[in-house]
Amino acid sequence: MSFHASLLREEETPRPVAGINRTDQSLKNPLLGTEVSFCLKSSSLPHHVRALGQIKAKNLASCDYYLLFRQVVLPPEVYPIGVLIRAAEAILTVIVSAWKLDHMTKTLYSSVRYALTNPRVRAQLELHIAYQRIVGQVSYSREADIGPKRLGNMSLQFIQSLVIATIDTTSCLMTYNHFLAAADTAKSRCHLLIASVVQGALWEQGSFLDHIINMIDTIDSINLPHDDYFTIIKSISPYSQGLVMGRHNVSVSSDFASVFTIPESCPQLDSLLKKLLQLDPVLLLMVSSVQKSWYFPEIRMVDGSREQLHKMRVELETPQALLSYGHTLLSIFRAEFIKGYVSKNAKWPPVHLLPGCDKSIKNARELGRWSPVFDRRWQLFAKVVILRIADLDMDPDFNDIVSDKAIISSRRDWVFEYNAAAFWKKYSERLERPPARSGPSRLVNALIDGRLDNIPALLEPFYRGAVEFEDRLTVLVPKEKELKVKGRFFSKQTLAIRIYQVVAEAALKNEVMPYLKTHSMTMSSTALTHLLNRLSHTITKGDSFVINLDYSSWCNGFRPELQAPLCRQLDQMFNCGYFFRTGCTLPCFTTFIIQDRFNPPYSFRGEPVEDGVTCAVGTKTMGEGMRQKLWTILTSCWEIIALREINVTFNILGQGDNQTIIVHKSASQNNQLLAERALGALYKHARLAGHNLKVEECWVSDCLYEYGKKLFFRGVPVPGCLKQLSRVTDSTGELFPNLYSKLACLTSSCLSAAMADTSPWVALATGVCLYLIELYVELPPAIMQDESLLTTLCLVGPSIGGLPTPATLPSVFFRGMSDPLPFQLALLQTLIKTTGVTCSLVNRVVKLRIAPYPDWLSLVTDPTSLNIAQVYRPERQIRRWIEEAIATSSHSSRIATFFQQPLTEMAQLLARDLSTMMPLRPRDMSALFALSNVAYGLSIIDLFQKSSTVVSASQAVHIEDVALESVRYKESIIQGLLDTTEGYNMQPYLEGCTYLAAKQLRRLTWGRDLVGVTMPFVAEQFHPHSSVGAKAELYLDAIIYCPQETLRSHHLTTRGDQPLYLGSNTAVKVQRGEITGLTKSRAANLVKDTLVLHQWYKVRKVTDPHLNTLMARFLLEKGYTSDARPSIQGGTLTHRLPSRGDSRQGLTGYVNILSTWLRFSSDYLHSFSKSSDDYTIHFQHVFTYGCLYADSVIRSGGVISTPYLLSASCKTCFEKIDSEEFVLACEPQYRGAEWLISKPVTVPEQIIDAEVEFDPCVSASYCLGILIGKSFLVDIRASGHDIMEQRTWANLERFSVSDMQKLPWSIVIRSLWRFLIGARLLQFEKAGLIRMLYAATGPTFSFLMKVFQDSALLMDCAPLDRLSPRINFHSRGDLVAKLVLLPFINPGIVEIEVSRINSKYHAVSEANMDLYIAAAKSVGVKPTQFVEETNDFTARGHHHGCYSLSWSKSRNQSQVLKMVVRKLKLCVLYIYPTVDPAVALDLCHLPALTIILVLGGDPAYYERLLEMDLCGAVSSRVDIPHSLAARTHRGFTIGPDAGPGVIRLDKLESVCYAHPCLEELEFNAYLDSELVDISDMCCLPLATPCKALFRPVYRSLQSFRLALMDNYSFVMDLITIRGVDIRPHLEEFDELLVVGQHILGQPVLVEVVYYVGVVGKRPVLARHPWSADLKRITVGGRAPCPSAAGLRDEDCRGSLLVGLPAGLTQLLVVD
């Protein structure tokens, strides 16, 4: 909030003011008409009298201000804007060609040209410029009265805070805010029109500008009373949603549209909306979501506040009923909380079980498990009390508390909220006032005054449940920019209550919310984007539908009785007296007054008196936004009860009153019936909780999904860029808007517009236009008419000292770039190449001047910055003033003493210490700097930056100084541009590779090499190519993209089957360690981070006495004195970036829908992704860039029908990242700074380094096994309908495959077995685990499969070599699943294997996993690839009868092909993807034969072979670059039917001759058309057969017997487990039985019946139904596989049956 005209009144200013009027440039306050009506009724204030003199006879009410502004007409073409068009075109050309996406040029060109020349758009643009010029002239001015000003045919008179607008004979008296609202509307429409032209040019339906113009005209022609007009405006968006659902819902009906009155009250608008619906539903949703372009209503304060106060008191249910329902909600809360707690921590929270508690709960608690039964029987939890789980954080960090919120200092100050003259007018009495305010009216000032020095003391009354009388007052403030005529109100409270609010909400957010799955309050924005995309997609597939709930005034419905039981439980969970319960009853003892300056309540003995409109004493609820999190929890509780009552499967996602429920379809009822039952139950339970669910306004849909202002249609986000761009304002809440902050705000708005869209282009092109318009308003004509100067100005961004500009915002494509400098240089390079701009003009605009001395502080705060002299920005000046102001403030408070230290100097000193680092690593410097107290101090000063409060608080800063400072900045920018001198010559840095140029430029300005900062510009490092005609060289290092089908323009707005790519989940850089026993506070967190980094440097062998000294000082200044350097879970540091952010999910700057049609992988970047070294590649950027390429090809009218690739083009951009050691050359001078927080930091126990002697590889493997085991157990419990993203419990995804390759996996597997044996699984868990592994689902199993893609690792599981003969597996996934299940298949063997782990390793803690892995990196060895054999042929061999693929149909074909290859002595063989993969796999195993697969750019076939192979044959024998490039063969080939060099087989009708090796030959082989004679080929001996070609089970009779016995006992075990489908396991077992019967010479039946079940607690598997309880299972299609013949010869004496269990023998022997 900023100052208003009220600064003039003596009574409110801290000192005499040289009057500054109208201190706003954009609308930040609600529109209120009370001052106007007071002015018309009375003439007591001098400026009101002056205003009344200007009024015409016909004077409109201020609420109808829009009627007058709609009539403004400007003479056409006042402003010359041709230069804007040319500049915009030039800028876009440069950007597009720098990104190598030149096909976009034409599309963008035409859209910009059309946008700025269309007469309607141009007229709106000129109107906007005219408004802005007036706003610039009248705001922040010294004259009280200005005028008359002309705005086309309107004349405006500004009188202090009032404005009189006149057209002809009609006038309208209004406040300055009304005028700003009109200016904002003009701006919004101008932006909307430009954005819609650009959007129209870029999407398949073509231009829709006419519809938008039509809509503006229709709305402007509505002539209805104020309230009806705004009812229409407000219902456009929901009515459109209703229309779309009415037309496009499939399985549920929706009559939501019938709630609204648009068809009757405005038929024109109705027909326009229906026309858009015909054209395209997405267009309708997109256009109707724009709500801010139709003026804002004036809030009707009297009705609005009366209604608000009534709602805060009305009783829907009796208090007794609410209290008992509150207890019901408490039971479900406990159940849900405990369930979440168990799944996160694998144990129960501390609980107390009351007498009479159910036995099943006791059992579950002892086992630390959660039973699915509890979901249905949640009432049992009435007897469970959750005990203390955490302490309240009583000393919260200032950063969390001090946002610039208004507070009211104490109850006595209420009279300062009102105008004395208005009180006199209303009550004819004088308003009694204290001589001065009792304290500050802003939180920031309270901080400076020392009110926040002792927060625990402030909160102490809440513990006792007795809040001071002085604190019990709340001011309800109307909210700005709302479309509700009756307004919404927010609460402004006293300091103590405000802090209470913050602490209570923070406790819930951090300690309770993470365990509840029904809300999105703790999710990051990217996680939410992923989640919403997934949800909206599931709805459209027809498996589920969504119910969108609409509660009427949700915030006002929560009564103390309903909250009391839950608050009591929370008080027990946080062990904090009456803390939460106090909050329930507080409103009953609080006085509420409405903030409306000119309508005060009556004052009796200095207390406000209740009148139901301006004041209420004691209500039932606190008002909006106060206990949001508590209420969200309660809401989801009653929704869960309601939905469980009618027995549907569902998910709830809600935040506040924005509740959506996804209901999954059921087998017995259709969706419509489900929806009606669900709504009925929800209505009933909402009523029980005292809430009113507006059932007719709740909608049900299976095509639309809306959550948190994001809208999805058929699973694809509706582009929100029109809505975002029409709301772009230049106000940032700055004290005083200056050029820099305006442009920065504009560029960041473009960023958020791109985030709301499925493509970045609209935001970028519109952003450039809006940017030029902003400059047009701000800069003088001399600059604006010089086209090349303007173009250059827009392409020079902040990284080389320019202004913020959308052109250097790659974040339209990615949300942030790791290094902006190479991109900046690439833009300038392109500018000089593509346009006629000379290098000297670039030098003149950039004016690069090296700073006289290195400013290390700026390098530490932004490691990518250059050391150059820049124009001093206003905020830096203001920051200096703020420091001075705080330092001179008379109060003695902790914060004042903190700021009496010369913070900036100390920061510079520390930065200088860090600059002695050799080599200089700015990212490490930055990480170290951030741990210090000065860094914390500077971050607190930034809090004051935005707050206007400091200005009013300090005697030193006048608002006028700030205004002058802003003008000075603009003037110096203009001077700099007009001045023709050139700075440092940039020429040498604008040639060649920008990666090298950026490194040199950094070296030039800093005078030293900076290591580890520069990252290459992705579009220079990689170039896109189509796979058609791509040569093998391009595939040497390439990222390959394969479209799912031919992509055309409609794919841009529909979803494919691939996952949505928003940037990978990059692993945590330094994992935040949990240091046990540290108190939770900002200081403790910093200490923790310091210790983590310390430990991390130890692991990296950075030993440096100076660094140790510095670290010790960091710890000391925070009050940490202990010598214990605690054990830390601390982590992996990739890419030299010790940033302490947790996982940064997602980096794309837009919703990348096209990625769902593309498969891509970096596996073919052979030199980089396969090596264990790190290179300078930012994979997220590269992947996104590839998707963007496809997007731009399609948008410019092309299609993508074949795979394409990004190939590494600039060799110098790839630099290997070397070792990471550094030392500090000098003794640090920094001595530490004072700390703000009083609590000392302690670490409880001494920690010994016993584990140092252990082998880190073994420790890491041992821990990994346990983590995988625990993750499996959590996966079992995860339900398939869970909406949260499927990640492993232990966050295993953070480990890269190259880390995993260095661990000995034989130990990992044994450790996993040890864990599974020790876990003593329950029946249902065992069943769940087996089901999950057999179905190959779950995130943990996917992780294992990803690791085991590398066959060398799989074969390295040492037990596997010995155990594989006992495992009957069909594929790699099957093998991994059975490997994990081995403890259940053969417990005996597993016991022996597990005992081989040295018992001393049982002491290692999986908490330190990351450190072990970091240490293992340097010592671990990657297992080598080895290639096993297949049976081979030669001209004179020795027959041994062992054939590959002996179980498959293509075995003979494969043998013949191998003979042909050997006969023709081939060295290279081409294979087409039409060949059976098993045959291709067999051929890959032939030594001395290079295989080229004819892939034509699509690696899918090759990946299939890799997956089938269990050794390194495929990866080593296939020449992959040539395979990808090959479209036809150039030699001998198999696959096609005819052609040169084709080897084909011809099946013989009858077997013509016996072959010396094969008993009978089924094929003749032909080369072209000649028969190849293979009659003399015979076998070569076979040493190490490949397990993929020869099943180990059939390798010898001995291994077959073991496998048969294992399999039998496993099946018998499974029969006893309830909940496992026995059939697939029985079929596997029967496969072995058939072979056994064949060996024994028994007849093999084609079909057999088994009887299965449990009789007398013993499992039964028999051929005869000897008990009625047995289940009958039929297995058909039985035939022995050819391998059996070989085993039959081996078993000459029937030794197979010796020692088999009797049951098994009975099954083997056929009666």
From Swiss-Prot:
It is an enzyme of class 2 (transferase). It is found in: Virion; Host nucleus. Keywords: ATP-binding, Host nucleus, Methyltransferase, mRNA capping, mRNA processing, Multifunctional enzyme, Nucleotide-binding, Nucleotidyltransferase, RNA-directed RNA polymerase, S-adenosyl-L-methionine, Transferase, Viral RNA replication, Virion. Its EC number is 2.7.7.48. It catalyses: RNA(n) + a ribonucleoside 5'-triphosphate = RNA(n+1) + diphosphate. Displays RNA-directed RNA polymerase activity. The viral mRNA guanylyl transferase displays a different biochemical reaction than the cellular enzyme. The template is composed of the viral RNA tightly encapsidated by the nucleoprotein (N). Functions either as transcriptase or as replicase. The transcriptase synthesizes subsequently three subgenomic RNAs, assuring their capping and polyadenylation by a stuttering mechanism. In replicase mode, the polymerase replicates the whole viral genome without recognizing the transcriptional signals. This is RNA-directed RNA polymerase L. It comes from Borna disease virus 1 (BoDV-1).
